[in-house]
Each structure stands twice: as structure tokens, then as C-alpha cells.
Amino acid sequence: MKKVKSLKGKTVAIVGMGKSWFDYNLAKSHGVHFDEVWAINAVADVIYHDRVFMMDPPSRFLDTDDAGGQTDSMIKVLKEHKGPIYTCELDDRCPGLVEFPIKEVVSDTNCFYLNNTVAYAVAFAYWNDVAVINLFGVDFSYKGNLHFAEAGRACVE
């Protein structure tokens, strides 16, 4: 995959499902401009966006209920979205999937700490020379077991 030249020097909002995603909505309602908005997973079913990052295999949503509450939203996104939806593997049932350019990103940027979807989106922005990255909703906390997955952080240290 080649770099997306139109991203160079741009301002991007990356929006995940954590509590601070409401701050994205507040920013937009107060006139804050982003050249592009990138949705993480099921946020793609809720807000306007230009790109989706979903580093789970599509089969996780299409063939299982492993994603819990995200399952129905992601099935809709995967079957209807024209893309790009950057992911780890392609699936013929999903028209908008684009395989994430992992080799190019790692080789060109020396970014190796890619352990969740937000980190992949940030690395993609870095690889494409995005000037400003605004993170919303990447503060992951879960009811019951407050920080069981990402330890409450976006893993983009």
C-alpha cells in the first residue's frame, strides 16, 4: 500500500469508545475542525467518519458473539460500509476492508509497539505524516473489571 498523500500535514480526530468520546462531540458542537475523523471499531456506526480502524478479524463479529455489545453494530458496518476499514485480514463478505499496511508502517517508522487498534491508527497517522492527532474515547475502562484489557490506557505511550 502507498501512503495517503492527502493526509500529509492534516489534523485528524481518532475516536474510540471510551468515556472521553463525548469530548469529541462537544468539540464538534463548538466548531472544532478536523480534516478527517477516524472511527475505532463500533464508533463507525455512531458518528460521521472518513476511515475505520478495526484490527480484529471480521469473523469475530460475523461468526461469533465474542464482541458482546459491539457485535450487531459491527456486522452492520462490515456488510454496508464502502471503506476504508483497515483490518488485519480480508473477508469476502465485507466490501470495504483494506488490509492494514503493517510491513510498510513498521519498516518506515520503526513503530513496533502496536498492541491495540488505537495504536495501529496512530501509527498509520504517523506513517502518513499527519500533523495533529486528537485522541477521543481512548480511555478504556470497563464496568465491573475497571481496566482488564488495556489497563485503562490507549497503549500509545
Predicted feature descriptions by range:
Residues 1-157:
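Metal-ion/cofactor- or nucleotide/acyl-coenzyme-handling active-site neighborhoods
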